[in-house]
């Protein structure tokens, strides 16, 4: 996994052989990791964090090379910021690994237990998923975050970093593997794909001959769409975060203003940022104008329906496309709706099943919204930007999942496990 061995392109046969070998090693490592006691995993993660700190000069040197290449390719400033590492950011990466080590062990928990009339004692026990493939773009810190979460849950990780961050990711992955090996755990439990060749992504999506159990994409819409379309293994992901704030007729105006400002503007570029504001017509006369004014005064562009345009000349007309747009910027779409039913219909028509919020003092209305909106995270009287594994107390997350199978919402260490049934008998046979 040496940085010096990274190649921009390799022959198709070479990539195929490389990926098969990575998959084989990951599967073997996953079998060992599944049996590692909690204390040993935690010690290994702390050793990995220490190795990252010790390797900081090497990591920063690799990152400088990545940044120089990215600037030469005229990549956007936002991409450069996500790619850039500093001594402080490297320390934050190491601290995040230590925080994951401090989480409760998700493996070996008894999830259920019962006894059958014939005397069979049955228990459901949490177990690792196996091998987790993570495909991500420009953030080098995902290497450590995703790797540590997978390892904490007793899994092996196969990591495919974006081409722009490959040197940085390789240096971080090598440090983590060194930390594992120092504690007697398999270094192959965290493997970075050491090539920029896109055929490697295709091999991962095909499952590496049955060696990958689940794929997690971290990146832009085009990456996630490709993974969801082409993967032959389960995917934990969300395509978009078209998140809504619905201000109900019985919403406290001061609360609604604070929640909306935070939901939209705390960080506009994250998947939990609100992209659409819905205002109940019953309170629009008192609530709509101040809500819109707050956004505009904070530098947020507002695209609204006719009623929203009427309250402020700075509002531009919303189109049908606006209701379906994840802006990831200081832009929001605003619509006045005819009550709770219309709000739920709008969210179900245009939403992405990520995170949606209602602001109201009416508990019955809140319960209906929470029950009927089919999103991974539904919120009452709080910001949509709490859609985060850390805020949920998960310590960290590998992503947000909006599917209906297995993981949904923030994917932390618990969601990176499955379960098995243990059946204890005393000689029973089935009649």
Swiss-Prot record:
UniProt pathway annotation: Amino-acid biosynthesis; L-proline biosynthesis; L-glutamate 5-semialdehyde from L-glutamate: step 2/2
Localization in the cell: Cytoplasm
GO BP terms, alphabetized: L-proline biosynthetic process
Organism: Methylobacterium sp. (strain 4-46)
SUPFAM superfamilies assigned to the protein according to its UniProt record, in alphabetical order: ALDH-like
Catalytic activity: L-glutamate 5-semialdehyde + phosphate + NADP(+) = L-glutamyl 5-phosphate + NADPH + H(+)
Name of the gene this protein is made from: proA
Entry function: Catalyzes the NADPH-dependent reduction of L-glutamate 5-phosphate into L-glutamate 5-semialdehyde and phosphate. The product spontaneously undergoes cyclization to form 1-pyrroline-5-carboxylate.
Family (UniProt): Belongs to the gamma-glutamyl phosphate reductase family.
Single GO cellular component term: cytoplasm
Full protein name: Gamma-glutamyl phosphate reductase
Gene3D superfamilies: Aldehyde Dehydrogenase, Chain A, domain 1, Aldehyde Dehydrogenase, Chain A, domain 2
GO molecular function: glutamate-5-semialdehyde dehydrogenase activity; NADP binding
Assigned EC number: 1.2.1.41
């Amino acid at each position: 996994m040496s940085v010096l061995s990274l190649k921009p392109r390799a022959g198709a046969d070479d990539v195929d052989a490389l990926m098969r070998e990575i998959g084989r090693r990951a599967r073997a490592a996953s079998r060992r990791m599944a049996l590692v006691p909690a204390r040993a995993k935690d010690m290994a993660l702390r050793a990995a964090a220490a190795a990252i700190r010790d390797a900081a000069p090497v990591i920063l040197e690799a990152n400088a090379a990545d940044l120089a290449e990215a600037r030469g390719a005229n990549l956007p400033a936002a991409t450069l910021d996500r790619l850039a590492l500093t001594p402080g950011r490297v320390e934050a990466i190491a601290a995040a690994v230590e925080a994951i080590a401090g989480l409760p062990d998700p493996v070996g928990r008894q999830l259920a237990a019962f006894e059958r009339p014939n005397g069979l004692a049955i228990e459901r026990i949490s177990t690792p998923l196996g091998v987790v493939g993570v495909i991500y773009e420009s953030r080098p810190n995902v290497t450590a975050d995703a790797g540590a979460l997978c390892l904490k849950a007793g899994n092996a990780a196969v990591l495919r970093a974006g081409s722009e961050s490959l040197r940085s990711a390789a240096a971080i992955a090598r440090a983590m593997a060194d930390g594992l090996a120092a504690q007697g755990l398999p270094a192959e439990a965290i493997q970075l794909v050491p090539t920029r060749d896109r055929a490697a992504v295709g091999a991962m999506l095909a499952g590496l001959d049955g060696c990958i159990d689940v794929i997690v994409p971290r990146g832009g819409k085009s990456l996630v769409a490709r993974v969801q379309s082409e993967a032959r293994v389960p995917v934990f992901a969300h395509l978009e975060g078209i998140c809504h704030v619905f201000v109900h007729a019985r919403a406290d105006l001061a609360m609604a203003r604070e929640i909306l400002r935070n939901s939209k503007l705390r960080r506009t570029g994250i998947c939990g940022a609100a992209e659409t504001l819905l205002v109940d017509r019953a309170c629009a006369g008192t609530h709509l104008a101040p809500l819109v004014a707050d956004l505009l005064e904070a530098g947020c562009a507002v695209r609204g329906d006719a009623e929203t345009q009427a309250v402020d000349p700075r509002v531009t007309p919303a189109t049908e496309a606006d209701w379906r747009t994840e802006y990831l910027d200081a832009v929001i779409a605003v619509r006045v709706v005819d009550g709770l039913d219309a709000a739920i219909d709008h969210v179900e028509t245009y939403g992405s099943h990520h995170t949606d919020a209602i602001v109201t003092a009416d508990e019955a209305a809140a319960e209906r919204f929470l029950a009927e909106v089919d999103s991974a995270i539904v919120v009452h009287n709080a910001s949509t930007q709490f859609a985060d594994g850390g805020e949920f107390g998960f310590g960290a997350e590998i992503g947000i999942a909006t599917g209906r199978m297995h993981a949904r919402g923030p994917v932390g260490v618990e969601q990176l496990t499955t379960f098995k049934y243990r059946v204890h008998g005393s000689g029973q046979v089935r009649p």
